[in-house]
């Protein structure tokens, strides 16, 4: 399964639109479902950022993408202020932040046929934070709904394909 959705359109986002199928051509993806007011999301963001800085992703082609989960409740400004402003005391995210709407469609991987499910429903209506590993065929292969960041679980996700 795949989807396309807007990003925060920063340099870190790699453009104004994120295409999961295109990104998966580079390797599997660790998706972190986030909310601006979600303390656990802030915690996971900080742990993933530290893991990247410490080289935990150096021996893998896995990329990281944060997906905003609460489009119906939080504004893009809330998401931007929380995850995109490097100079303040936010939870700056140095990887792609995707901002789908409640009606963003999903597509069958490889055929681009509409699945009939919007993105939130297609990925199981994840709460926040939820971590999901998506393999290079677009399949959800691993998931954790642990609220507070956990190094063991992050390590499990990063090494899933080892």
Residue spans for each PLM region:
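N-terminal "domain-start" segment that seeds a small globular fold
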Residues: 1-22, 43, 102
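Short active-site neighborhood of thiol/selenol oxidoreductases, capturing the structured segment around
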Residues: 18-48, 63-67
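Proline-centered helix-kink/hinge sites
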Residues: 3-6, 40, 46, 129, ...
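Sec/Tat-exported extracytoplasmic proteins
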Residues: 24, 34-35, 49-56, 123, ...
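Thiol/disulfide oxidoreductase modules built on the thioredoxin-like
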Residues: 24-26, 101-158
């Amino acid at each position: 399964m795949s989807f396309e959705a807007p990003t925060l359109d920063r340099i870190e986002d790699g453009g104004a639109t994120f295409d999961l199928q295109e990104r998966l051509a580079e390797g599997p993806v660790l998706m972190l479902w986030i909310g601006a007011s979600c303390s656990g999301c802030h915690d996971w963001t900080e742990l993933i950022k530290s893991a990247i800085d410490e080289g935990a992703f150096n021996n893998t082609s896995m990329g990281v993408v944060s997906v905003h989960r609460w489009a119906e409740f939080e504004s893009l400004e809330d998401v931007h202020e929380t995850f995109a402003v490097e100079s303040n005391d936010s939870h700056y995210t140095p990887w792609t932040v995707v901002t789908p709407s409640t009606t963003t469609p999903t597509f069958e991987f490889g055929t681009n046929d509409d699945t009939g499910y919007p993105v939130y429903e297609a990925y199981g209506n994840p709460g926040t934070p939820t971590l999901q590993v998506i393999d290079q065929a677009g399949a959800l292969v691993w998931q954790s709904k642990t609220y507070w960041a956990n190094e063991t679980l992050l390590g499990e996700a990063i090494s899933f394909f080892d």
